Each structure stands twice: as C-alpha cells, then as structure tokens.
Amino acid sequence: FPKLPSYQAFCRRLNRLAEAFAALAEVLFEQKLADAEPTHGYVLDSCPVMVSVGSRSNTAKTARKLCNLTRNPTRNLWYHGVKLHVFAQLRPRRLPIPCAVQISKASLCDLWAAKQIDLDCAPVTDGRLYADRAYIDAEWKAHLQAERNITLITPRKRKKYDTLVSEDAVSTHISALRQPIEVFFNWLQAKTHIQSASHIRSCAGLLFHIFSSLALAALLLRFYY
C-alpha cells in the first residue's frame, strides 16, 4: 500500500479539523436552544480534561500552552490538563443544553473563567443562574443582576462553627437544582470519554479531542435527547 499516509500524517489531518468540529458543535447547540422552550433557568460548572494524572502529572510536558498542573478537590487528585467550563439552560427531566463552552488552563479559578465567558458573549439573560460555592462573588452577582437580569444563586458559604440547619436545607435544595449539570458531564464522559485525554501528545491533538467530543455530544443532544 505505497500511497497510504503514515499514522503521523493521518493524525495531523485529523487535528486540522478541530476548528470545524468547534463550529459544528456551536451550530448544533444553537439549533437545540432555538427549538427548546425557554425555561429561564441556567446552570454553570466546570469539569477536568486530564492529560496526565497522579505522579506523572508533575513532570508532564504535553500541550503546555494550554495545560498546567492543578489539584481536583472533588476527586482528590493532581492532574495536568485543562478545564471545560459550561453555561447551560435547564430543561425539565432532560439534559441541559449548553449555551456557552470554553476551555482554560486547569489551575484557572472557575469564577474568573465564568466572568470572562460572560464578558465575551453574555450567554445567559433574564432568569436564574445556579452555581456552586466557587462562584460566590458579590460584585459579579450585582453585575449579572443589573446588566443581564440574572439572579445568581449559590449555596451559603458556611462560617466556622455555624450550625444553622435551615441554611443547610437551602444549600441542599440549590445543590439539587444544580444536579443536571453534573448529570450532563457524566453523560458527556460516558459518550465521548472527553475527560480522559492521556493519549494526547500536542495542543492540536487536545483541541481536536475536546471539540470532536463536543460535536458528537451536540449531535446526540440535537436529535436524540
């Protein structure tokens, strides 16, 4: 088979399609949002895309322009990679629909990333935005209310030795309202393995991995969910 390309050449061709997959995902998500009834309820969160984990993450050099080292408190592990930040519109008894998606270095504060997304494209307006404690910020909350007509709702940050049971109930309720975004991330991982990127060897490869995964998820969400 003298005319077959090498494996490296084939990978390079695939990696060049990253921007096309990003555009495809954007179009499909926008079509799904246009077809869905507005609920005026939104969620915000992030998930890790891990290029290297554990002891290997300390010496990882892959895609350093995009990736760096940080600790994931939920999983209690260190990883080298990026974060995927998502604003999504809630739907009753269905998966939420992403309104905006952005990647950042793994160590970037979730709040800063959310502020940048809001500044870039104002993905949500007129409603309630449910988020976890990482997004507690009085100034940003006031900005969202004044500029976007969005009420930012987060669990109460408990003070030391605070035992107010009523506030615990409120936080539990807010966590339940945020549950669909966790379900979405679990579904996305099950369908695409987007969080598992140990096979990645370059920035271009990482972008292809992320955007092709999002394009597949958008396609499934558009026609089957």
Q: Positions of the model-derived regions?
A:
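Short alpha-helical elements
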Residues: 1-225
